[in-house]
């Protein structure tokens, strides 16, 4: 097995798209650790039970600590606010990507 590309991937939002990406990352061995933050405790419990994440958080700031990849899988309108919240806690080398359909507000933040 090859060395994973990422040490820690943090998903912010774990709906249909986020959970699908997490599943692929696990199947392909792309990360040593996958964590997520979402508002629903039930979603976090289900994701852990399914083996999609190792740890779940209600606070996105906790999820992004030490992450080298952050995947924003949020409604487009929530993206800018979440980015502003987590930005001070990201490492200099952290890659941030999103799955939203518009990019202007993401680039601005």
Protein language model features and the residues they cover:
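Short glycine/serine/threonine-rich phosphate/pyrophosphate-binding segments
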Residues: 19-20, 79, 105-106
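Rossmann-fold NAD(P)-binding glycine/threonine-rich loop
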Residues: 99-109
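Short, function-defining helix-loop hinge/capping sites that tune catalysis or transport
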Residues: 54, 81, 106-108
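NAD(P)+-binding Rossmann beta1-loop-alpha1 motif at the extreme N-terminus of oxidoreductases
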Residues: 1-65
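Structural motif
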Residues: 12, 37, 73, 97-100
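Alpha-helix N-cap/helix-start and coil->helix boundary motif
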Residues: 40-41, 76-77, 103
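Alpha-helical structural signal in soluble globular domains
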Residues: 24, 50, 85-89, 109
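Rossmann-like NAD(P)-binding element
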Residues: 60-97
